[in-house]
């Protein structure tokens, strides 16, 4: 697993791959050393866990400084060699996939499996297929969740096939994830990327814009801490998610805003905000209600029902009563 000294790579190494009953050995590979915190995360894994440092040179990717990491099964299986790996997982940032593929430089066995975990699929998978080498099966994966909890049960992973796989790799991924209680979703690269522009790129941008607007609105001695005391359930929910985003990997979020189509999807969001702001400023209360009615119609009754249930579950989890939300009352 390349790029597995921390983040999603480390989490999935421990709670996905090391939990599979047909995986005996997981090798963590990274340019960064394995921290004490990472060693704690990976401890007591069912599979043998090893760490090897990655070095890049004009000759490609080399594996150095190998060590066995304490785990429930710590029997050494010998020095790891890239040419003998059954499965190679790219858990590196989107911007680094090209560098890693150049480093692999034909080192993979002709029957090896290769997957990635990036949040964009079309361009990375095309690059992987091009450079993986003859006979290598390539499939894309995208864990659609954050790094929380100690189990993959109930979490969703998107699986994206390529023409290099005869179905064996994607069936293995699908079967293993389902045995662990995860939810899988098979989707084309193009459809995945289109939906992620909305579900991820636009959503992140909206949260960043919300955080920027909130902090820009504070005056004098006003503070976020005091504002939170006045927080309605929607504000607390959006504020919490925005705050969480700001504590995560800023490089990752920056790369998501630079993916193909990101500029256009931000423009769609900005145009909608500007149109609604103009409509609300120039229209009557009835006009605003018409806008809301139209938006509700576009969502549809079924989606609104699901959204209401999910939001109420979220409010309860945050110990906030949705009935406490403030409404404008006609005085």
What are these regions (language model features)?
Residues 1-55, 59-60, 80:
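NAD(P)+-binding Rossmann beta1-loop-alpha1 motif at the extreme N-terminus of oxidoreductases
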Residues 23, 109-112, 134-136:
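A short helix->loop->beta-strand "cap" motif at the edges of active sites that frequently abuts
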Residues 55-108, 155:
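Rossmann-like NAD(P)-binding element
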Residues 106-124:
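ADP-ribose/adenylate-binding Rossmann-like module
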Residues 120-185, 189, 196:
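Rossmann-fold dinucleotide-binding core
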Residues 155, 192-247:
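Active-site-proximal catalytic alpha-helix in oxidoreductases
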Residues 225-306:
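Interdomain hinge/lid region at the active-site interface
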């Amino acid at each position: 697993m390349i790029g597995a000294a921390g983040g999603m790579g480390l989490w999935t190494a421990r709670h996905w791959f090391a939990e599979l009953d047909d995986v005996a050995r997981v090798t963590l590979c990274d340019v960064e050393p394995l921290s004490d915190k990472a060693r704690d995360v990976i401890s007591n894994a069912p599979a043998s866990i090893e760490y090897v440092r990655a070095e890049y040179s004009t000759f490609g990717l080399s594996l150095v400084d190998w060590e066995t990491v304490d785990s429930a099964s710590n029997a050494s299986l010998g020095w790891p060699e890239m040419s003998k790996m059954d499965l190679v997982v790219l858990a590196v940032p989107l911007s680094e996939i090209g560098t890693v593929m150049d480093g692999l430089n034909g080192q993979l066995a002709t029957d090896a499996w290769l997957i990635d975990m990036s949040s964009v699929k079309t361009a990375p998978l095309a690059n992987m297929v091009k450079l993986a080498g003859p006979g290598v099966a390539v499939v894309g994966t995208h864990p659609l969740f954050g790094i929380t909890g100690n189990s993959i049960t109930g979490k969703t992973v998107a699986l994206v096939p390529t023409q290099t796989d005869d179905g064996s790799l994607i069936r293995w991924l699908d079967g293993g994830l389902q045995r662990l209680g995860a939810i899988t979703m098979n989707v084309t690269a193009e459809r995945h990327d289109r939906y992620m522009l909305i579900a991820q790129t636009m959503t992140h941008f909206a949260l960043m814009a919300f955080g920027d607007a909130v902090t820009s609105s504070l005056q004098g001695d006003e503070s976020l801490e005091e504002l939170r005391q006045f927080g309605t359930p929607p504000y607390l929910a959006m504020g919490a998610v925005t705050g969480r985003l700001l504590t995560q990997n800023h490089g990752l979020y920056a790369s998501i805003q630079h993916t193909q189509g990101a500029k256009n999807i931000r423009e769609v969001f900005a145009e909608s905000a500007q149109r609604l702001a103009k409509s609300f400023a120039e229209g009557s209360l009835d006009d605003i209600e018409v806008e809301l009615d139209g938006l509700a119609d576009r969502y549809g009754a079924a989606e609104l029902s699901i959204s209401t249930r999910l939001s109420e579950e979220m409010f309860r989890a945050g110990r906030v009563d949705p009935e406490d939300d403030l409404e404008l009352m006609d005085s």
